[in-house]
Every structure is written in C-alpha cells, then in structure tokens.
C-alpha cells in the first residue's frame, strides 16, 4: 500500500511449484489480496521480471501473460493495471538497495511481520546473487517506483518483474 509518503508491504508469496499464469493470478488474489480486502481494481502498478515465456513456444513475455490472466480472472478484455518490467540497467540493484535503506531509516517503508522471507532478506542480504536476493528484488521493483526521488518527481520511468 502507498499513503503518499510511506510504502507498506502487507504480504509476500512465492509459488511452491510451477504454475500457469492463470493459477498464479487466482492464488495471488486469494492469498494476498482478498485477506486485506483488496482486489485487482485497487492495484495501481505491477512490476514483473523481464523474462519471456519461450518455454511455451510463444513469443510473449510472462508479464503479458499475467496481464491476460488478470483480465480473464475479472471477466474483462483488459486488466485494470499492466505488469511492466523494471529498470535493470547498470547499478540498478545498488540504487534500489540505497532507496530501500533510506526509506527504512526515514520511516517511509514498513513491512508486515508475516513477510518473513522479505524481512530475512532485508536483514541479511549482502549484495550476493543468492536466494536472499529474490525477495529483495521483488519488493525493490515496486519500492523503487514509489520511493525513488526520480519517480516521485514525475519523471517517466520503467521498472521490472
């Protein structure tokens, strides 16, 4: 959630096994959104990694497939928001780490106590490319959008899943 000055991470979820995009969307809705009284219509932005779904033999990104699955789940032709990729250029991981660190110190980032993987990642990740980086990246893509001085200034910016 975003209050205009602070970002609240209310839930985390990682698929226990491979799932279709439709299964992911249904599970996200059931386990992450509805318990907080939220639905896809209240989502303003979505960020997803810039991977492709070539494993299925079609020229489409996973973000596009998630967008279609959200629209289908809601019985609409278009989703109320679009999953877009985050910026992953040189120095972007380090920049997100600085943004998140500053926000924590300034009281602009709050993480619900149920988000144990993210809390563990924030406490112990030291910059390596390991399992601790995945929760950091996922939360960082959205945190960057809301907490970065660049994006808050109204400058055009693209983020990744």
Q: Where are the predicted features?
A:
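Mg2+-dependent endonuclease catalytic cores in nucleic-acid-processing enzymes, primarily RNase H-like
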Residues: 3-130, 149-150, 156-161
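Generic structural signal for bulky hydrophobic/aromatic residues embedded
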Residues: 125, 141-142
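Histidine-centered active-site/metal-ligand motif
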Residues: 134
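Short, hydrophobic alpha-helical segments
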Residues: 142-150
């Amino acid at each position: 959630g975003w209050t205009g000055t602070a970002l609240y991470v209310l839930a985390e979820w990682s698929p226990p096994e491979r799932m279709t995009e439709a299964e992911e969307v249904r599970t996200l809705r059931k386990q992450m959104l509805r318990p907080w009284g939220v639905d896809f219509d209240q989502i303003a932005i979505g960020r997803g990694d810039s991977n492709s779904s070539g494993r299925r033999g079609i020229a489409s990104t996973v973000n596009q497939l998630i967008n279609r699955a959200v629209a289908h789940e809601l019985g609409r032709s278009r989703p109320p928001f679009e999953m877009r990729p985050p910026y992953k250029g040189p120095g972007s991981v380090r920049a997100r780490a600085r943004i998140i660190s500053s926000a924590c110190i300034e009281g602009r980032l709050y993480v619900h106590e149920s988000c144990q993987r993210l809390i563990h990642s924030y406490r112990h990740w030291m910059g390596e490319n390991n399992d601790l980086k995945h929760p950091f990246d996922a939360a960082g893509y959205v945190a960057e959008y809301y907490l970065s001085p660049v994006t808050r200034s109204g400058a055009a910016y693209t983020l990744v899943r």
